[in-house]
Curated annotation (Swiss-Prot):
Localization per Swiss-Prot or TrEMBL: Cytoplasm
Gene (UniProt): rsmA
Protein name, entry field: Ribosomal RNA small subunit methyltransferase A
A Pfam family it matches: RrnaAD
Residues that, per the record, bind S-adenosyl-L-methionine: 10, 12, 37, 58, 83, 107
Length: 268
C-alpha cells in the first residue's frame, strides 16, 4: 500500500531495525505501550512479542483495516482508527491499561511531532517515550541555552522529561525515504517537573512570550503579558536576569524564577 503524503507516512519494513528500536526502548513483559501510527504493523508486531499490551492508533482507514487483519493473531494488540490528538489518554488508559501508567513507542508522523509529544507529556500516566522524529527536532529538544536550536519546544519538553538521542537513521531505511535524517529519541518523564513553578499556565505564557519575537529583549517581548516595561525591568533584575537578555539565553530554572516572580506580582 502506497504511503499517503497528507498523513506524513514513512514506513520501516526492516525487521532487524524494528527489533533494534524495540530493544532500545527498553520495554518489557509488564509494560503497557501506546503506539501512534500503526502503519503496516511492523513495529506493532515487534512490540506485541515483548510487552503486556499494545494499543496502536492509525488515522488512515485503509492501513487500519489492513494492520488489524495482519495482527489479529496477537491477543494483546488493540488497533484504534482515530486521530491521537483528539482522544482522551486517561480514558484510553482506563479502558485498555486498567488505569495503569504506560510507555509510548512510535514512528511519529513528522508533520505533527511536536503536538503529539506535548500531548503525551501533559498526561500524568505517560512514564517514558521512545519515538522516531526528524533529527532536527531531536536536536532542538536536546539543545542548550544560547544555541540556535534552543527554543520553546526545548524548554517545554525538558521541563517535563529528560531527553536523549539514542541513534540516528538515514532516509534510506524508510519507505518512501523522507528528505531528512531521523533520530530515535528517548524521553524519560519526571515524576514531577524539573523545576517548581507556582502556576504552569503562567510559566507557559512567559516562555511563549519570550520566544515569540526572538530578536526582542525580554523587557520588550514580555510586555504582551500585560506588565509595563518598568515592572518587567525591575522584576528581571530582582531574579538576576538582565532586562537586555533574550529568551534563547535563559535556562529552565531562570524561566521558572521569572514566572514565579511575576506570579507573586499578580497575587499582590
Amino acid at each position: 500500500m502506497k504511503a499517503k503524503k497528507k498523513w506524513g507516512q514513512n514506513f520501516i519494513f526492516d525487521k532487524n531495525l524494528l527489533s533494534k528500536i524495540v530493544r532500545a526502548s527498553g520495554v518489557g513483559e509488564e509494560d503497557f505501550v501506546l503506539e501512534v501510527g500503526t502503519g503496516h504493523g511492523g513495529l506493532t508486531e515487534e512490540l506485541a512479542k515483548k510487552v503486556k499490551k499494545v494499543v496502536s492508533f492509525e488515522i488512515d482507514k485503509e492501513l487500519f483495516e489492513m494492520s488489524r487483519e495482519k495482527l489479529k493473531i496477537y491477543k494483546n494488540v488493540v488497533i484504534i482508527n482515530e486521530d491521537i490528538l483528539e482522544v482522551d489518554l486517561l480514558e484510553i488508559a482506563q479502558e485498555h491499561f486498567d488505569g495503569n501508567s504506560f510507555k509510548v513507542v512510535a514512528n511519529l508522523p513528522y508533520y505533527i511531532t511536536s503536538p503529539i509529544i506535548m500531548k503525551m507529556l501533559d498526561c500524568k500516566l505517560v512514564k517514558e517515550m521512545t519515538v522516531l522524529v526528524q533529527k532536527e527536532v531531536a536536536e532542538r529538544i536536546c539543545a542548550l541555552p544560547g544555541t540556535k536550536d534552543y527554543g520553546m519546544l526545548t524548554v517545554f519538553v525538558n521541563f517535563k522529561a529528560k531527553p536523549e538521542i539514542l541513534f540516528n537513521l538515514p532516509p534510506k531505511v524508510f519507505v518512501p525515504p523522507p528528505k531528512v535524517e531521523s533520530s530515535l529519541l528517548k524521553l524519560k518523564v519526571y515524576d514531577k517537573p524539573l523545576v517548581e513553578v507556582k502556576d504552569e499556565k503562567l510559566f507557559s505564557e512567559v516562555v511563549r512570550a519570550a520566544f515569540g519575537q526572538r530578536r526582542k529583549v525580554l523587557s520588550n517581548s514580555l510586555k504582551v503579558l500585560g506588565f509595563s516595561k518598568e515592572v518587567l525591568h525591575e522584576t528581571l533584575l530582582k531574579v538576576g536576569i538582565s532586562p537586555q537578555a533574550r529568551g534563547e539565553t535563559l535556562s529552565i530554572d531562570q524561566f521558572a524564577n521569572l514566572a514565579n516572580a511575576l506570579y507573586l506580582l499578580i497575587k499582590e
